[in-house]
């Protein structure tokens, strides 16, 4: 039972604004009083603020000037409220706002400063409920079954917050003793007295509700994920089938039916997977590779997964294996472009396939180790926080507390489960800097809680393994060695047009002068530390002479690094000055120039000298340890640091090498007091690397995209993928027919605007105003414009338009504007858009490739044709490379890439547009450019473009 002597006054205020000192005042007060885990009393009143309530506050809260006109002033209720709050603990959802605002209101009327204990529910839910999608009051309540009918009504918000408080009390009281013991050293970091009361609640410990396993310092959930997705019903007695070549494939079962287009796909794709692969010219056999192109949103993923699994089932039956029983090997391996799409595929497509087939499917998501919690690294980092509390940031401490709680709950260790706010980049950089053991060491130390290693092991016997392209490219040989990519497996590459980009990114090697300087400084400290040990202890050992060579290399490294900075400054001083006045951020360095650049040679000499220091320092440290001069812990620490330095140095050595296959992307920042330089060494073309990957994989591969039609029409399959012999399945026209025509009684309306020039004729500020004019006009049509998507090609223009909208919109309306900016969690952005009753989404055109939106959108705005900027280092490198081949950059790369991006936009529009959705292009090159006929080829036939005035859009119904 929770202690009964304390009364918690759970407070919520509604105010005219956020700052008391700026003249804002209270307009409504709600207090819910909690004792013994129950709401025992309430206090609620409107307050007359002696001023007009801003219109946006009325829209947000529903509180009007008329409503508060006869309400008491604050001073009229102050004494009663002061007495009600005496001897209570003040609780609020964001205590910093409500407590301070109320305190200043009291003091303004002669009361002393409040000295109540304070408890904040925001910090508690962030740490105690680490997997919650949102910590906003309304969204958290909705997700956890707490009634909140009138959000932004003070008493309703206060009562809801009271129930959150009770949830937190219960969760703390049911924690395992070992878990709370790990949290206790960090409780003083919580705001006010929040941590003190958490400790008080734990005194009434009830014992954990779930079993747990304690492997110090972590309390872990012994329930392991079994990785099976279960169907709505078992068996195929009621199933209906279609014939696909020699295969019988289920087309309807347990409430799931293949759509007509999916059936057509299955009839082509299932035989491809079933028949023996060959790369010969034998016409009776299917090639090893096939390409499938169909529009986004037709659920082609269900068609190809069912095709692959059905082919495997049929083969199993013919060899005598029991249908539906995995033979101990992976059946289907799917790679998609992003981690978000991996999880969407699992949640949506695999569940549909499971229902259709009437059997469970073991499905494992594989992604990089850093996507899973690594307990060895986390343990070391938390130990650092405990040992050095003076330098520990509150942010890092509270994230660590949340992770302790989460580890008691998670079955997978997948960081995707966590609220995005816990995926702080700086925090995880600090964690990932810690060393860890080998794969076998991790398994031996943590057993089933070596989460990444467990996923790899489980993948070997999975029905479906879902990868992302980065993992596929980096680990394909590991997947072959681990018997996941076998001859019997069936590989599907979704969003395959992104695969060459992934290979290109995976091959990038980076040299950052700041990191090199910091590493060299740290190595110098290590040299001096070891030298001090040698001198202080008058050591005469064989390794002493190595210190001379280390010191010599140290000086050589510093000299060459300084020379590198000076040479960069001399070479790029003028260019960097002009760069301040342009949008250029970096320089393209062609391979022939990179080869002879004196600054590259200096950088290479610097890191070469650093590399020569590592091995001697290890030898010296080992001998000092063997002599008892260094403790085991100190020796292991030095060894771990040197290994980290060596890993970075090898990358820098690779970066500073010259090769005809690589160019450099050079970024120079000439500050007043220092110069920072970044060199990214990049591939000119990824074709040979990608071809090597495909040749190594022993099984059939289906490559899928909505953007392949234009690639094939330009004969670019071989240049992009290195594949010559392949099957081709195109369903683009069938896709558009299904999405745009079926179920509609009219063509899709598309518009150009008479009022404006084509957007490419304006500068950025002018373009932002044009876009804002259009969006503002659409937004005023509240009857038909509920959801609006605006596609940008430039983030800079997107930010400029966002600023323009902020100047024009009310605070309430501006709250409906969702902007991609630099958010890493696109999934959360998509959910925010989908869950809103009205919303405007500003996103770069590529946003749609990483996220499948289910929300029905009423207007799609194309601000500018999705061409890549031609003067970036990457595009300049393409121009150089194509020129060397005698090809044309615009015709062979820029235009096809733009058409592929445009196809993606049209596909998403077809997939997520409402019944009466409209399309607006502010770029008139769509119809007037010399290449307009090629654009017309990728536009849906059902899209009917016409020219109108801006004001006519207000009357669209």
State each model region's role.
Residues 456-462, 813-841:
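Conserved motor-coupling elements within RecA-like helicase/translocase cores
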Residues 755-763, 825-923:
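Conserved RecA-like P-loop NTPase helicase motor core
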Residues 316-462:
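A substrate-engagement module of RecA-like helicase motors
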Residues 1-2, 167-242:
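Acidic two-metal-ion nuclease catalytic site recognized across multiple nuclease folds
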Residues 2-117, 130-152:
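Conserved non-catalytic scaffold segment of RNase H-like nuclease domains
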Residues 86-106, 130-132, 136-198, 919-921:
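Acidic, Mg2+-coordinating catalytic module of metal-dependent nucleases/exonucleases
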Residues 233-235, 245-250, 284-295, 368-429, ...:
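Conserved coupling segment at the C-terminus of the helicase ATP-binding
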Residues 232-293:
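Conserved pre-motif I regulatory segment
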């Amino acid at each position: 039972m929770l202690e009964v002597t304390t009364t918690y006054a759970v407070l919520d205020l509604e105010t005219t604004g956020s700052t008391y000192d700026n003249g804002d005042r209270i307009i409504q007060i709600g207090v819910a009083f909690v004792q013994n885990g129950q709401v025992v009393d309430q206090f609620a009143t409107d307050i007359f603020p002696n001023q007009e309530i801003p219109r946006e506050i009325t829209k947000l809260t529903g509180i009007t000037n008329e409503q508060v006109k006869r309400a008491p002033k604050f001073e009229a209720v102050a004494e009663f409220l002061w007495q009600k709050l005496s001897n209570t603990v003040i609780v609020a959802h964001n205590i910093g706002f409500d407590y301070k605002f109320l305190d200043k209101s009291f003091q303004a009327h002669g009361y002393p400063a409040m000295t109540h204990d304070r408890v904040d529910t925001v910090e508690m839910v962030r740490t105690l409920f680490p997997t919650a999608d949102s910590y906003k009051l309304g969204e958290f309540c909705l997700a956890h079954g707490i009634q909140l009918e009138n959000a932004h009504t003070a008493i309703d918000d206060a009562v809801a917050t009271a129930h959150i408080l009770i949830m937190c009390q219960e969760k703390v009281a049911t924690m395992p003793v070992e878990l709370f013991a790990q949290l206790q050293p960090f409780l003083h970091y919580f705001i006010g007295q929040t941590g003190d009361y958490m400790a008080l609640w734990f005194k009434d410990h009830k014992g954990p509700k779930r079993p747990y396993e304690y492997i110090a310092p972590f309390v872990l959930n012994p329930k392991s994920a079994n990785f099976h997705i279960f169907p709505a019903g078992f068996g195929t007695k009621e199933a209906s089938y279609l014939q696909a070549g020699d295969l019988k494939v289920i087309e309807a079962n347990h409430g799931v039916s293949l759509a007509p287009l999916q059936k057509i796909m299955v009839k082509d794709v299932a035989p491809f997977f079933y028949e023996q692969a060959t790369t010969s010219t034998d016409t009776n056999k299917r090639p090893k590779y096939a390409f499938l192109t169909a529009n986004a949103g037709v659920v082609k993923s269900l068609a190809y997964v069912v095709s692959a699994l059905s082919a495997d089932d049929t083969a199993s039956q013919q060899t005598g294996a029991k249908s539906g029983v995995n033979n101990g090997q992976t059946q289907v391996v799917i790679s998609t472009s992003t981690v978000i799409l991996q999880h969407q595929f699992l949640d949506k497509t695999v569940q549909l396939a499971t229902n259709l087939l009437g059997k469970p499917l073991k499905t494992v998501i594989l992604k990089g180790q850093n996507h899973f919690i690594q307990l060895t690294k986390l343990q070391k980092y938390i130990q650092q926080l405990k040992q050095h509390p003076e330098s520990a940031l509150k942010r890092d401490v509270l994230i660590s507390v949340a992770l302790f709680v989460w580890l008691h709950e998670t079955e997978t260790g997948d960081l995707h489960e966590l609220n995005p706010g816990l995926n702080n980049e700086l925090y995880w950089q600090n964690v990932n800097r810690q060393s860890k053991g080998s794969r076998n060491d991790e398994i031996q130390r943590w057993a089933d809680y070596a989460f990444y290693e467990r996923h790899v092991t489980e993948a070997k016997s999975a029905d479906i393994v879902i990868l992302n392209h980065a993992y596929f490219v980096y680990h394909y040989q590991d997947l072959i060695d681990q018997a996941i990519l076998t001859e019997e497996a069936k590989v599907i590459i979704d969003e395959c047009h992104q695969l060459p980009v992934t290979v290109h990114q995976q091959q990038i090697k980076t040299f950052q002068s700041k990191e090199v300087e910091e590493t060299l400084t740290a190595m110098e400290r290590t040299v001096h530390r070891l030298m001090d040990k040698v001198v202080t202890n008058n050591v005469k050992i064989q390794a002493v002479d190595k210190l001379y060579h280390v010191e010599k290399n140290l000086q050589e490294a510093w000299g060459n690094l300084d020379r590198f900075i000076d040479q960069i400054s001399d070479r790029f001083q003028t260019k960097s000055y002009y760069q301040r006045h342009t949008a250029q951020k970096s320089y393209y360095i062609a391979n022939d120039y990179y080869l002879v650049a004196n600054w590259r040679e200096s950088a290479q000499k610097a890191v070469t000298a650093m590399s020569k220091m590592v091995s001697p320092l290890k030898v010296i440290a080992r001998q000092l340890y063997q002599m008892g001069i260094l403790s085991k812990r100190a020796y292991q620490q030095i060894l771990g640091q040197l290994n980290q330095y060596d890993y970075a140095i090898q990358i820098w050595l690779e970066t500073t090498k010259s090769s005809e296959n690589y160019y450099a992307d050079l970024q120079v920042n000439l500050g007043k007091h220092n110069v920072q330089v970044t060199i990214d060494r990049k591939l000119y073309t990824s074709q040979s690397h990608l071809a090597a990957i495909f040749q190594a994989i022993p099984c059939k591969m289906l490559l899928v995209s909505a953007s392949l039609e234009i690639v094939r029409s330009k004969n670019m399959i071989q240049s992009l993928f290195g594949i010559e012999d392949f099957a081709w399945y195109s369903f683009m026209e069938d896709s558009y027919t299904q999405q745009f025509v079926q179920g509609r009684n009219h063509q899709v309306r598309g518009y150009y605007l008479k009022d404006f020039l084509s957007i490419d004729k304006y500068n950025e500020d002018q373009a932002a105003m044009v876009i804002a004019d259009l969006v503002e006009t659409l937004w005023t049509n509240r009857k038909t414009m509920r959801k609006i998507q605006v596609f940008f090609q430039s983030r800079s223009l997107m930010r400029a338009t966002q600023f323009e909208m902020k100047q024009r919109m009310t605070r309430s309306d501006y709250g409906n504007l969702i902007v991609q900016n630099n958010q890493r969690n696109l999934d959360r952005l998509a959910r925010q858009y989908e869950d809103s009753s009205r919303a405007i989404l500003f996103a770069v055109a590529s946003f749609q490739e990483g996220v499948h939106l289910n929300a029905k959108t009423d207007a799609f705005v194309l601000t500018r044709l999705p061409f890549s900027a031609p003067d970036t280092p990457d595009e300049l490198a393409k121009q150089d490379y194509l020129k060397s081949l005698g090809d044309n950059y615009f015709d062979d790369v820029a235009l096809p890439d733009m058409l592929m991006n445009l196809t993606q936009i049209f596909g998403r529009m077809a997939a997520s547009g409402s019944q009466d959705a409209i399309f607006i292009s502010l770029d008139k090159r769509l119809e007037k450019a010399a290449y307009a006929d090629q654009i017309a080829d990728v536009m849906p036939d059902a899209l009917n473009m016409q020219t109108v005035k801006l004001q006519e859009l207000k009357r669209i119904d």
